[in-house]
Amino acid sequence: MERIERISEEIKREISDIIQNELKDPRLSKLISITEVNVTKDLRYAKVYVSVMGSEEEKANSLEGLKSAAGFIRREIGRRVQLRYTPEIHFELDNSIERGAYITKLINETSAQNKGSKDPEDT
């Protein structure tokens, strides 16, 4: 694994820990997952993809809460991870988990319909 990937994974772990144990913002949903962190090669910026299970309002509130806590999170990362530069953090909403769950649901429904509509003469 190359250095940038290792740093991205370490930052991902630390941000997850900070969100779970340090942030007390009531806007944050209980079901926030950090799905991916992409750090630029110069280590100046980190794009953090978060998945929030809940309504659109809960997603928007959670994203706002994370954005307002970005400075605190950056400071904590600076204390926990030894880097020359602590990356500036940008949060982005990631809907891939919900899309995956929706596609799985569609596949299951289609599969159930196909089983129910099988003609006994076809077997």
UniProtKB/Swiss-Prot annotation:
<dbReference type="GO" id="GO:0043024">
    <property type="term" value="F:ribosomal small subunit binding"/>
</dbReference>
<protein>
    <recommendedName>
        <fullName>Ribosome-binding factor A</fullName>
    </recommendedName>
</protein>
<dbReference type="InterPro" id="IPR000238">
    <property type="entry name" value="RbfA"/>
</dbReference>
<dbReference type="GO" id="GO:0005829">
    <property type="term" value="C:cytosol"/>
</dbReference>
<keyword id="KW-0690">Ribosome biogenesis</keyword>
<comment type="subunit">
    <text>Monomer. Binds 30S ribosomal subunits, but not 50S ribosomal subunits or 70S ribosomes.</text>
</comment>
<comment type="function">
    <text>One of several proteins that assist in the late maturation steps of the functional core of the 30S ribosomal subunit. Associates with free 30S ribosomal subunits (but not with 30S subunits that are part of 70S ribosomes or polysomes). Required for efficient processing of 16S rRNA. May interact with the 5'-terminal helix region of 16S rRNA.</text>
</comment>
<dbReference type="InterPro" id="IPR023799">
    <property type="entry name" value="RbfA_dom_sf"/>
</dbReference>
<dbReference type="InterPro" id="IPR020053">
    <property type="entry name" value="Ribosome-bd_factorA_CS"/>
</dbReference>
<comment type="similarity">
    <text>Belongs to the RbfA family.</text>
</comment>
<dbReference type="GO" id="GO:0030490">
    <property type="term" value="P:maturation of SSU-rRNA"/>
</dbReference>
<keyword id="KW-0963">Cytoplasm</keyword>
<dbReference type="InterPro" id="IPR015946">
    <property type="entry name" value="KH_dom-like_a/b"/>
</dbReference>
<dbReference type="Pfam" id="PF02033">
    <property type="entry name" value="RBFA"/>
</dbReference>
